[in-house]
Amino acid sequence: MNNFKSTALGLVKWIGLIALSLLINAAPMLFLRLGKNLPIYAEILLVALYLILVYLIFRSLWQRYQKRVPEEKKKFKLSGKDIGFAFLFFFFARVAAIAGVYLNLILSGNSQTSNDSAIQGLGGMMSSQHIFFALLFVATIAFIAPIMEELIFRGFGTAFFFKNNQKVLPAIVTSVVFTLPHITQLTEFPIYFALGLVLYLSYARRGNIKDSMLVHILNNL
């Protein structure tokens, strides 16, 4: 019974964190769409408030996540070897993405996923008149989203439900959950599921979420 309660509570927390991640990712997109007529001072204020809020949220979540990480893993740092592995996993992620794009093209006739098309559409809305919103949008795609998604999907997703010696089940579960918010069609599932598996493997190599954060950042740059 206690195990069921713990799992149910973990599920509620995880869903809440995923919703938080989606809101953080969506805010800069809303700024671009709805902030066309805002004066420059309002734009700067919104960007500053967003960055402060994201920093406070991340710091709070990171502190809570660290309580679930074994002491020996807290001391792990990124060495040259680890950066090399990150680029290797990044290569695997690109191969998986290219294969997934071709599969999506065969199955649906679309050469891009709906998520990529939406991002490119928003990118086309960027202008020098709203440079701060544009820079925030780029920073979110390249850095903020990868860091928050790794902490929430793979970090907390693994910590809430799985033991340290479990690998296959958490890889599948976290990759499926990571995939669902990123797709609008089933034909897009293999692309993001494969990316999720690569990101999980980069994390599971030594149990350091910073590794998958780096791979995810490289993939989004």
What role is predicted for each listed range?
Residues 1-103:
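N-terminal, membrane-interfacial amphipathic/helix-forming hydrophobic leader that caps
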Residues 11-15, 44-45, 83-88, 123-145, ...:
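Hydrophobic alpha-helical transmembrane segments
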Residues 26-29, 172-175, 179-183, 187-221:
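Functionally important transmembrane alpha-helices
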Residues 34-50, 132-137, 165-174, 184, ...:
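Membrane-interface starts of transmembrane alpha-helices
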Residues 46-54, 140, 191-199:
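Hydrophobic core segments of transmembrane alpha-helices in multi-pass, intramembrane catalytic enzymes
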Residues 105-130:
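Membrane-interface interhelical connector segments
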Residues 148-173, 201-211:
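Membrane-interface helix/loop boundary segments of multi-pass membrane proteins
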